[in-house]
Amino acid sequence: MSLAYSQATSLLLSSTTRGGVPSLMHIPATNSPARINTGATPFWKLPFPARPLRQYKSITRARNQVILTAEKSVDVDTEKNTHHQKATAETTRELVERIRWMLQNMDDGELSVSPYDTAWVALVEDIGGSGRPQFPTSLEWISNNQYPDGSWGDRKFLFYDRILNTLACVVALKTWNMHPDKCEKGLKFIKENIHSLENENEEYMPVGFEVAFPSLIETAKKLGIEIPDDSPGMKDIYAKRHLKLKKIPMDLLHKMPTSLLFSLEGMKGLDWQKLLNLRFEGSFLSSPSSTAYALQHTKDELSLQYLLKAIKKFNGGVPNAYPVDMFEHLWSVDRLQRLGISRYFEPEIEECMKYAYRYWTDKGICWARNTNVQDVDDSSMGFRLLRLHSFPVTIDAFKQFEKGGEFCSIPGQSTHAITGMYNIFRASQVLFPGDHILADARKYSAKFLHQKRVNEAIVDKWIITKDLPGEVGYALDVPFYASLPRLEARFFLEHYGGDDDVWIGKTLYRMLYVNCDTYLELAKLDYNVCQAVHQHEWTNIRRWYKDCSVGEFRLAERSLLRAYYIAASTVFEPERSGERLAWAKTAILLETILSQKLHSEEKHTVVDEFKHGSISISGNGRRHQTRISLAETLIYTVNQLSSDIKQAHGRDIHQQLHHAWQKWLTTWEGRGNLGEAEAELLVRTLHLSSGLDESWFSHPKYQQLLEVTSKVCHQLRLFQNRKMHDPKGCTIDLVTGTTFQIEAGMQELVKLVFTKSSEDLDAHTKQSFFAIARSFYYTAYCDPEAIESHVDKVLFDKVV
């Protein structure tokens, strides 16, 4: 309901309404100071007429029901809109069910077939001694998957990928004297394009290409296939091969699991009896090609069973790595969260996290379960997600990736991948007090990524994605503590390529449940539905702003919009409209009151008027406009919010909300710690409007969270003011961008929120404290110009 009242000092609202909106009535002025008592109920005490809230349809039974689209409301409806809303709801439901099925049916990983690995499998001769192919279906897959130009490979054209895959497939077909026409087409493609290798971006060179490709050329020559290898590009590849083979510690290779097990194919001088002790579940580091090469030499039964399982799953072909279960479970959750649609899949995500934790080790993890080789990319992603889901993971996982203050992708290697450093940077921001190795990792990875950005060199060796520079740039510009959920989703919707993103292993490959157009379609649809709800609410906020004369206190409409944006970017779900509006209006009123230059007597009058729910008049019979408007607006808004929450949750929170405001006003009047008081008021308002029972407010964990949140929010407000008014005198840590005290407070809060304890609060309640602190951090950390651009992008730029 909107309130319309005059700026004249002697107007009150009567109980008569027009169309549900209270009408105006003139009240004669009295001649002496007194509290108004006309026999009529003051407008700020009027009961709110029952009004239909915007209703929503949900498709889950989660604690916070997920909203699909708005039903008919009293003020916005046409037959066309209703049809569109129903169609949107149905499309959303279908997409959610499709993704839910994918998550519920995850096993060892869904990914594309690698022609290169399939060719190595096809080369295996029957271990029974018949002289025939051991895996004829792999040869069949090769024969059925040649492109018209004669090549094999991923649909994304890279010469490295196409030439390696094509030569491997030609060698396999030639070995078994099959399809000479396909062999000829493949050779023609290779000879016409091999010179292009020297022009390719070296960052996109597949894993082990400099060893695998020359080995294939040698095998091809034994079959009578001549491949031109005297070009400058080929000579460079041979030089890299010589250097790499020279560095391989053969004694170490046979003694303990290393990443070298992933690329055994074509290597000479191997002691297979020793190497067989290093396989797990029949495979060598989940590599079909490496395992096929081992089977050729050992006829090992476990290796045979591993390959048979993979061939059956992928209909004759095999992928570049299998299984990739840890990779798939973790990266899928990460994508769903950053796209802003994880709330649809909370049970499924919880199962993914339980699965990941089951195979987590103190040394970290790799792309597959139970491997004895770990990498920083998977370990960082696993650590971050498990910690954010309150699983007790240890920072010891990062020790083997650190040496002398530097961090590497794989223990013992000195190379760095952008995504590895990017994910360790993200993980390092979820640190608890005393996590020194994470602080070191943050410093190192931030410096590395900043330098790459300055040099415009953000190209990764593991993935070709739509906008990796954008992803890295967002992480550097908006750290975890400042990353509001809707802001992150809005940017990631532009960075995420869906099906078009491709990974780089031994060949290019697709992770079908990680990079998925279905995720993208749902995310875009959901974002635009939420945005439409937010825009509708913004219209109502503007009406409230004008009707309550908030603008009379010189609070600019842009400040109003910024306050709503902060709330909507944090509590964005349509069904949480009550919480969002309560937060926004509370923040707006706080800013309005704090902007007034009132002397102590005026402050006291405002506090007294609010406390008693009545308005004082001056000696000449007139009421002071500023004082009265502040009190009237505040009383009215508290009543309005209380009425809305009672209608939504069936609970009357008026007394508690009034008390929360009274406590803040008392602090304001007495010049107390307003930063802490402001945070406490916002927390209380958010919890009351969410329907949280007041009994939880006295819970020891609640009190601890409130104390830490209030303290860090106060520090952030002071920091923000210093940045604005005395930037030269504001000491800023070069790594974190704030102060040591603020970072320590945020670390303490993160630990309280994301660790479980006996007699704990529920996760949703705990995370709301972090949400409030995050909003303070965001406004203190980000420049006003950046925030202005974020406001427009999040609230008004539709995702297409």
UniProtKB/Swiss-Prot annotation:
GO terms for cellular component: chloroplast. Residues 1-75 form a transit peptide. Its cofactor is Mg(2+). Mostly expressed in trichomes of leaves and fruits. Substrate binds at K244, K461. The Asp-Xaa-Asp-Asp (DXDD) motif is important for the catalytic activity, presumably through binding to Mg(2+). PANTHER family: ENT-COPALYL DIPHOSPHATE SYNTHASE, CHLOROPLASTIC. This is Kolavenyl diphosphate synthase TPS5, chloroplastic. It comes from Vitex agnus-castus (Chaste tree). The lineage of its organism: Eukaryota, Viridiplantae, Streptophyta, Embryophyta, Tracheophyta. The gene is TPS5.
